[in-house]
Amino acid sequence: MSVHLSGAGLPAAVDVVVIGSGASGMATAVTAAFHGAQVVVLEKADKFGGTTARSGGWLWIPGMPLATALGIDEPAGAARDYIAHEATTHFDAARTQAFLENGGRAVEFPPRHTQVQFDMPRSFPDYHAEARGGQAGGRSMVTRPYDGRELGQAIAHLAPALPELMVLGMMLASGDEIRHFTRAFRSLASFRYVAARLLRQARDVLRHGRGITLTNGNALAARLARSALDLDVPIHLRCR
């Protein structure tokens, strides 16, 4: 993969043209390239990653293998009931069934064949866990933190996370890292962790101009981009 700063130099013919470099587009590009297609990604912005890179980037998919590994059961019909409750008059039974039947299978591919790896906090509840079909955990997962140096020079073109999602310019991982920051002045272990994290952030900014410990949606966008790089998928920016 190479990142191009314009639409110049596009190949004359490809098998798949992907419009947009968020998670959906890049996952499509990586999957198609993995199966032998010649792919090109076109992005209108001057950075790749789309909304995914700027967001939390969590996935909500019931019945995932990660949940099973944690010993969390998915009651029969509960996810369908929850979606119906949340969607109200917009509920689509056929689409919901397709999502529930294929969602778990879809997320088995990235950890096996790409740089994308997921973690699942045991106690991350549905937004309305008390609603019909809601669960206290086992449906939400997040991309494992990623070292931005693995992207090489391409990290300069990765869209940053929203400032509202950062602390002192740092993207914090969910779970233990957030707990350390909230307990920094109540726990010596947390204070040491936060101090080391701040020093690492300062070093990264001096060396690379930005923090390179990538988390949440930024980590997902970066891992997908690294996977595309490995498969020689070009990304063209500023394509309008």
Regions found by a protein language model. Name each.
Residues 1-16, 34, 222:
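Extreme N-terminal leader/targeting segments of oxidoreductases
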Residues 14-15, 34-37, 209-211, 218:
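Short linear motifs at secondary-structure transitions and domain/linker junctions
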Residues 16-41:
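N-terminal Rossmann-like FAD-binding beta1-loop-alpha1 element of flavoenzymes
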Residues 237-240:
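A conserved short coil-to-beta-strand element within the FAD-binding core of flavoproteins
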